[in-house]
Each structure stands twice: as structure tokens, then as C-alpha cells.
């Protein structure tokens, strides 16, 4: 191989290595974003479950009160 070909090959390899490093950094950022979103999603699911339980409790109370009103009428 000529020196020119080796130089071109070295340049391409260096560019490829730089691209790989950039992609690794982007991947790490995306992993962190994913982790943050997963935690937020978990919190929202827990909050949703709590609100559904509160709604069910209120529905029971309202149903009970409506039953009392109907029995008095």
C-alpha cells in the first residue's frame, strides 16, 4: 500500500472512531433521559392509582348518601 492510501485509511479510521465516541455520548444521554422518564412515569402511575382509589371511595360515599336519601323519600 502506498503512503497516500495509508494516510486516507488512517483519516477514515480516525473519523470513524470520533463518530463512535459521539454516538456513545449520545447513547449515554438518551439512557439518562430514559431513566428520568421511567421514574416520572412510575410516579405518575402511583399518583393515578391513588386518585383512582380516592375516586372509588368518593363514589361509595355518594352512593351511600343517595341510598339514604332514597330510603327517606
Curated annotation (Swiss-Prot):
The entry's keywords: Cell cycle, Cell division, Coiled coil, Cytoplasm, Septation
GO terms, biological process: division septum assembly; FtsZ-dependent cytokinesis
GO CC terms: cytoplasm
Coiled-coil features, chain-numbered ranges: 3-69
Low complexity bias spans: 41-50
Highest taxon listed in the record's lineage: Bacteria
Primary location group: cytoplasm
Region feature (Disordered): 30-50
Subcellular location: Cytoplasm
Function (record text): Non-essential, abundant cell division factor that is required for proper Z-ring formation. It is recruited early to the divisome by direct interaction with FtsZ, stimulating Z-ring assembly and thereby promoting cell division earlier in the cell cycle. Its recruitment to the Z-ring requires functional FtsA or ZipA.
Complexes and interactors: Homodimer. The ends of the coiled-coil dimer bind to each other, forming polymers. Interacts with FtsZ.
Family indicated by similarity: Belongs to the ZapB family.
Protein name, entry field: Cell division protein ZapB
Taxonomic lineage from the root: Bacteria, Pseudomonadati, Pseudomonadota, Gammaproteobacteria, Alteromonadales
Gene from which this protein is expressed: zapB
